Amino acid sequence: MVELDPNNIPQHVAIIMDGNGRWAQQKGKMRIFGHKNGVKAVREAVSYARKVGIKVLTLYAFSSENWNRPKKEVNALMALFMQALDLEVKKLHKNNIKLNILGDVTGFSASLQNKIHQAEKLTENNTALTLNIAANYGGCWDIVQATKSLAQQVKEGKLAVDEINAQVLQQALVTKEQPQVDLLIRTSGEQRISNFLLWQIAYAELYFSDVLWPDFNEKEFNEAIIAYQQRHRRFGGAEE
């Protein structure tokens, strides 16, 4: 693999993990087979991110629109989520990785909410990498919940309208004090944002990979970082 510039590693990488279903269909399998193999790709992505010094990795696991999928698939995804929490959290903790679940967790079963709380509590003081799993998440929902939170603070006299600015709103998003996204990766060849981290990707570099998510490995991730390092980020400014 091409070596990375250690002085130009993106702090925050977000990934839209797309293509599990198509990967399974290409192999004549049920869609859930693709999701299960997608978990293996998650493990490899997390390991790579920690190894190269990425500080925050956000993975889009289940959007608020995914509830519209067939009930059988949704139920299988919820069971897989529970299983992954059981199997992976201790490994994350051992590797000093902090886990956050971003999204409206009240939409999940009480047992899943309890597992989420336990996992976040166990890993809350870890510092090597912050792993955000966006589940029952949508970028529009995130901005709306932040706006409601600020409106409630104004109503209670804790915040003046004139004090609301971009920084204050950003702190009210589910990502809170985390850095803005530097690099957004989407797999499977699709070139859409799909309501993901709409505020947080304002100045992100976009990288679209034709590889289906279960086949997205360390080599593919490395190529995405290389592409990022070859770009000149202007943040709205002019070319020098």
From Swiss-Prot:
Name the residues that bind Mg(2+).
Answer: D18, E205
Q: Which Pfam families match?
A: Prenyltransf (PF01255)
Q: Which GO terms describe its molecular function?
A: ditrans,polycis-undecaprenyl-diphosphate synthase [(2E,6E)-farnesyl-diphosphate specific] activity; magnesium ion binding
Span-the-membrane segments of this chain are none
* Catalysis: reaction(s): 8 isopentenyl diphosphate + (2E,6E)-farnesyl diphosphate = di-trans,octa-cis-undecaprenyl diphosphate + 8 diphosphate
Q: Which cofactors does the annotated protein need, by name?
A: Mg(2+)
Its EC top class is transferase
| Any one of the GO BP annotations | polyprenol biosynthetic process
Annotated function: Catalyzes the sequential condensation of isopentenyl diphosphate (IPP) with (2E,6E)-farnesyl diphosphate (E,E-FPP) to yield (2Z,6Z,10Z,14Z,18Z,22Z,26Z,30Z,34E,38E)-undecaprenyl diphosphate (di-trans,octa-cis-UPP). UPP is the precursor of glycosyl carrier lipid in the biosynthesis of bacterial cell wall polysaccharide components such as peptidoglycan and lipopolysaccharide.
Classification via PANTHER family: DEHYDRODOLICHYL DIPHOSPHATE SYNTHASE 2, DEHYDRODOLICHYL DIPHOSPHATE SYNTHASE FAMILY MEMBER
Q: Which family does it belong to?
A: Belongs to the UPP synthase family.
Q: What is this protein called?
A: Ditrans,polycis-undecaprenyl-diphosphate synthase ((2E,6E)-farnesyl-diphosphate specific)
Gene name, per UniProt, is uppS
